[in-house]
Amino acid sequence: MSSPVNSDSSPVNPSQRALILVVERNPAVQRLERFFLEQAGYSVEFASDGVSALERARELCPKIVVTEILVPRLDGLSLCRALKSDPRTRSIVVLVFSHLHAEDRALEAGADAFIVKPIDEENLIDIVSKLLEIRKEGAGG
């Protein structure tokens, strides 16, 4: 079983945790997402809108950006296009989610994956883990 969840016998050093930038404006949802993703062994940072997410992505170089399509100031699809067109951020994996069935539009914008909401904790962690594994394999291991 290749779960990203840590066992007591193999703790993850915080400096070795993959950094995930989540675009989420609701503080209650941020707390839940932080809890679930940190329990799974990831470091988590948040941006409350697309413009600040783009700035934070350039500053932090996270492994993954997780964004909804409908976010303020710069929608998730425009954020994805901006990330994928910038040499500093084009290698960042982008996971887009929405209530809208917009997978084609998300993939055309450069998203690496798309999820229809609602997203449950296990599904989110599983997809993040798989995307990181694919990215690692693509980078030569």
Language-model region placement:
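Hydrophobic/aromatic residues positioned on beta-strands within the core alpha/beta folds
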Residues: 94-97
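Active-site beta3 strand of CheY-like receiver
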Residues: 60-66, 71
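Two-component/phosphorelay signaling modules centered on CheY-like receiver
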Residues: 27-45
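Alpha4 helix (beta4-alpha4-beta5 surface) of REC/receiver domains from two-component response regulators
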Residues: 30, 34, 78, 99-116, ...
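Non-catalytic signal-transmission and effector/linker regions of two-component phosphorelay proteins
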Residues: 1-21, 25, 122-141
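The feature encodes the CheY-like receiver
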Residues: 71-72, 117
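Acidic catalytic/metal-coordinating carboxylates
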Residues: 49-52, 75-78
